[in-house]
Structure formats: C-alpha cells, structure tokens
C-alpha cells in the first residue's frame, strides 16, 4: 500500500513539475489553448487578418521611432481605426421559379416559391431583427422574393437597394468539375469579376464610427451566396458548388470587430414544411404554377 501511495504521489508530482515547466515556457504556453496543436498549419489554412483591407495596422502610419510621443501617436491612431461593433449579414436565396422564356422577365416565382418566401418572411419577423439595410438582386425572382418578405418585416420598400452586382452567374470554375454544367470561360471571367465586386462591396468589418451591431439582409441567388460563404470564411472559393442551399433559405454570417468571420446559419430552411423544401428548378412545368 505504501509503495502504491509513493508511486501515485511521485507520478503526480512529476506531472505537476512537467506542466509547471511548460507553463513557464512562452513557446509551450501557446499550445495550451485547445485551438492549437503541435501539427504545422498548412499555409492555405492560415487566416488573413487583412482580408477586407481594413486591418487597423494596415491603415495607420507605422512607427517612425521608439520615442514615447511617436508611440502615443501610433497607439491613438490605431485605436481610432479599430471597429467596435459586429456586422451581421443575412443572405436569403430567392424562392422556386420557372426557367421559361428567353429572358429574365419571364422567370417568375411558382406558387410554391411564393409560399417559401412567405415562410422566410415570417421567420425573419420572428427573429425580431431591426434591419439597417436590405439589398436585393435586380433579377425578377429575387425582386419578387424581396417584395413578399417585406410584407412580413418592418422595412420601407423605398429604402431597399437594388443591386445588379448580385445577379446570378458563374463565379469561378468549380472543383471538382461537373459534367452537366459547362459555362464558357468568358462567362466565368465576366460573372466572376462582378460577383467578387459584390463580395467586396458588402463583406467587410464595421466602420470605426459604427456604434451598434448592424444587420444587413441580402436577397440573392444560390451560386452567389455559396461563393460569398466560401470567400467570407476563407475557404477555397473553387469549392462553392459543393454547398447546396434550399430556395428561400437563410444563411447568416457575422463579421466581428476583429475581422474574424463566423457562420450562424447555412441554408437554414427548417422553418418550412417538408413539401416546400426545394433547391432545383422544376422541370415538370405542367404541374407547377
């Protein structure tokens, strides 16, 4: 019994001495966080803190010397350039629509698509969000979805921003490639630059003078939303087509004051009854209104 007690005490003391030494080692202390490991991080997985070109240290004139006055100047400017509140960006895909006719003008929501938009509007109303801005793609199906949602939430239609940059398109050649969908290279070049411009327009940390958390609703399209998610989370943008989101679903991204981005919902449509869950264009036109 005495030997067992001595063994336990000795082992405990040994572990205590080991961890005490690890804590005293600054380099080892970094690895005490559960978010770190001893395995080297692949370069592509490293977070770019200046992804939105609004990292305070990139905006402030660098220190010219180590004098107290210069350090005070630098610290004051750095603090002034920092965001203080979070931005919430809620993305809604349009409802189901019919791809008939030769132009976007004929691509109206189906009855099911209108019902989907109604459920989404009710869900957004239940969340009790006070919207700072609502932006909608200029395509018919997004405009109709936006109009239906606006009937459920408190926001003046005249204040909605209509943005052509958000129109559906082919953002970037997907990986892995798919055989059933092969846009021309020129389409990727044309659409990709536009959709990337839309991302840069709407995704960034708050301005330093923003005094409260803000909420922006964007009503758009599946390809655009999926690309936005990959870009915002700094995942390989080529993987956008691996994500599937339902019609009129809700995707919620939050940009913290530090510039870190997290996702709260991805294609959430659990608030709809099962018979309304769709994600593809209906092919049986005869049975769809």
Swiss-Prot record:
Disulfide bonds: none annotated. Keywords: Hydrolase, Membrane, Mitochondrion, Mitochondrion outer membrane. GO terms for cellular component: mitochondrial outer membrane. SUPFAM superfamilies: Phosphoglycerate mutase-like (SSF53254). One of its GO terms (molecular function) is protein serine/threonine kinase activator activity. GO terms for biological process: positive regulation of mitochondrial fission; positive regulation of mitochondrial fusion; protein dephosphorylation; response to anesthetic; response to heat. It catalyses: O-phospho-L-seryl-[protein] + H2O = L-seryl-[protein] + phosphate; O-phospho-L-threonyl-[protein] + H2O = L-threonyl-[protein] + phosphate. It is found in: Mitochondrion outer membrane. It is an enzyme of class 3 (hydrolase). Its EC number is 3.1.3.16. Displays phosphatase activity for serine/threonine residues, and dephosphorylates and activates Pk92B kinase. Has apparently no phosphoglycerate mutase activity. Interacts with Pk92B/ASK1. Belongs to the phosphoglycerate mutase family. BPG-dependent PGAM subfamily. This is Serine/threonine-protein phosphatase Pgam5, mitochondrial. The lineage of its organism: Eukaryota, Metazoa, Ecdysozoa, Arthropoda, Hexapoda. The gene is Pgam5.
